[in-house]
Amino acid sequence: MNPHATPVLVLSLALGTTITISSNHWVLAWTGLEINTLAIIPLISKSHHPRAVEAATKYFLTQAAASALVLFSSMTNAWATGQWDITQLNHPTSCLLLTAAIAIKLGLVPFHFWFPEVLQGSPLMTALLLSTLMKFPPLTLLLMTSKSLNPALLTTMALASAALGGWMGLNQTQTRKILAFSSISHLGWIAIILVYSPKLALLTFYLYAIMTSAVFMALNKIKALNLSMVLTSWTKTPVLNATLMLVLLSLAGLPPLTGFMPKWLIIQELTKQEMTPAAMAIAMLSLLSLFFYLRLAYHSTITLPPNSSNHMKQWYTSKPPSTPTAILASLSILLLPLSPMIHAIV
């Protein structure tokens, strides 16, 4: 791909995201979603590998179907109520259609099948965009219409996402697939609290985006596409691998790391809303994903692969870790003491 095309595509992604999150009219929001879809497809398929082309095709087909559903739900609402305002989504059928459309765009269960396959066929930095930036516009639409959505439906989808995201990630050896199922599991936490506390859902997404970005950037630095490549990277980049372990434990939600904050606040809010069984269920289901985070963390720091031949060990990394990776990793590990202030600001 032409090197000058990448900045144009990234700017288009920023433009599409900005249009969607700042719009009040359904057609403008839909336009932003379409700009995003068209801008990310060349980034997915830029390696010209058959798997990358397949991933781009799958992504295009699912996103096109979801965008058509968004447009159809807004037209149904406009037909019934005469309103094109995003916050005035009052028709029950429109709410159901929009929930399905956004679930497809986000990769929530039961519309999750495309997401791990697309991430597996994408380069690591494109997978980072798909897991974070590309989820922000659809999530914004859900937040703007949260008062009209069905809480029971969202809770069911959230619990199913947390269960399936943890369950399907257990036997994976590819790092991108592990992070795809991690994303599905975290979306479950966001969806379960969305109706009751939209601001807390947004805070959870922000923290998830910070932690996932740190993991993807670390994996990109050590060029680790599967667990065996993570194993061999310890002698080359020991500091980065140790940091990766801490960020993965934070992503798992272990105290005293940043990732514990959203889980703690969500369980607290669900208990206030008298949804203790749902809080207990999603807390127990997070133990499934904890297992594969621990396995990835164990591979990144503790074990070295057996090797019978003599070879020179590389004890020092040739390049220092980049500043963005260091900043994101620090935020992923150290923000828990600031949680009262962060919760008050958000």
Swiss-Prot record:
Q: List the disulfide bonds.
A: none
Pfam families documented for this protein: NADH_dehy_S2_C, Proton_antipo_M
Compartments where located = Mitochondrion inner membrane
Task: List, alphabetically, the GO terms of the cellular component aspect.
Answer: mitochondrial inner membrane
Q: Which InterPro entries match?
A: Complex_I_Subunit_2, NADH_DH_su2_C, NADH_UbQ_OxRdtase_chain2, ND/Mrp_TM
According to the UniProt record, what class of enzyme is this?
translocase
- What are the transmembrane regions? 1-21, 25-45, 60-80, 95-115, 124-144, 149-169, 178-195, 200-219, 242-262, 274-294, 326-346
Q: How does it sit in the membrane?
A: Multi-pass membrane protein
Task: Enumerate the UniProt keywords alphabetically.
Answer: Electron transport, Membrane, Mitochondrion, Mitochondrion inner membrane, NAD, Respiratory chain, Translocase, Transmembrane, Transmembrane helix, Transport, Ubiquinone
Catalysed reaction(s)? Answer: a ubiquinone + NADH + 5 H(+)(in) = a ubiquinol + NAD(+) + 4 H(+)(out)
- In short, the EC number is 7.1.1.2
- Which domain of life does this protein belong to? Eukaryota
GO BP term (any one): mitochondrial electron transport, NADH to ubiquinone
One Gene Ontology MF term: NADH dehydrogenase (ubiquinone) activity
Q: Which family does the entry's similarity section mention?
A: Belongs to the complex I subunit 2 family.
Q: What does this protein do?
A: Core subunit of the mitochondrial membrane respiratory chain NADH dehydrogenase (Complex I) that is believed to belong to the minimal assembly required for catalysis. Complex I functions in the transfer of electrons from NADH to the respiratory chain. The immediate electron acceptor for the enzyme is believed to be ubiquinone.
Classification via PANTHER family: NADH-UBIQUINONE OXIDOREDUCTASE CHAIN 2
From the Swiss-Prot or TrEMBL record, give the protein name: NADH-ubiquinone oxidoreductase chain 2
Query: What is the organism of origin for this protein?
Result: Mareca falcata (Falcated duck)
What are the top taxonomic ranks of the organism? Answer: Eukaryota, Metazoa, Chordata, Craniata, Vertebrata
